[in-house]
Curated annotation (Swiss-Prot):
One of its GO terms (biological process) is protein transport by the Tat complex. It comes from Rhodococcus opacus (strain B4). This is Sec-independent protein translocase protein TatB. The keyword Hydrolase does not apply. Residues 97-143 are annotated as: Disordered.
């Protein structure tokens, strides 16, 4: 209910309520607000229960289309294309064309490779760190 109000705004509202209502009327106002919220909650739950009672088994038939609509509300254009046109494969959109068994680069930690579980995939030999003053080997094919 108060998802869009941060702590700073909430504190400003409390200080404003204290200044406007004063310390003697503030507890009464807080109790009135809590009673009102409880009453609204009871009305809402009573209305939903009354709807379930009146519709009976048809209520479940109504819930299915509503659940489908609720699922579509969170869909972005990219998610719709991925789900319906690409069968869930978003490699075209993300550019990640690695196969599940291949070695892929970890984007969160540059310079490291993810280890694959496939033993047939060849791996590069592990390089030892260079000693102080040692020059790195030169690859003549790369230069």
């Amino acid at each position: 209910m108060f998802g869009n109000i941060g702590w700073g705004e909430f504190m400003v509202l409390l200080v404003a309520a204290l200044v406007i209502l004063g310390p003697e009327r503030l507890p009464g106002a807080v109790s009135w607000v809590t009673k009102s919220l409880r009453q609204v909650r009871e009305y809402a739950s009573g209305a939903s229960q009354q709807l379930k009672d009146e519709l009976g088994p048809e209520f479940e038939d109504l819930r299915k289309p509503l659940a489908d609509l609720n699922q579509l509300r969170g869909m972005t254009p990219r998610a719709v294309i991925t789900k319906h046109l690409l069968d869930g494969d978003d490699s075209i959109l993300t550019g990640n064309f690695d196969k599940p068994g291949s070695v892929s680069f970890d984007k969160s930690n540059p310079g490291t490779k993810a280890v694959s579980a496939d033993p047939s995939t060849p791996t590069a030999p592990q390089n030892k760190p260079l000693a102080a003053g040692e020059r790195p080997p030169i690859d003549l094919d790369a230069t």
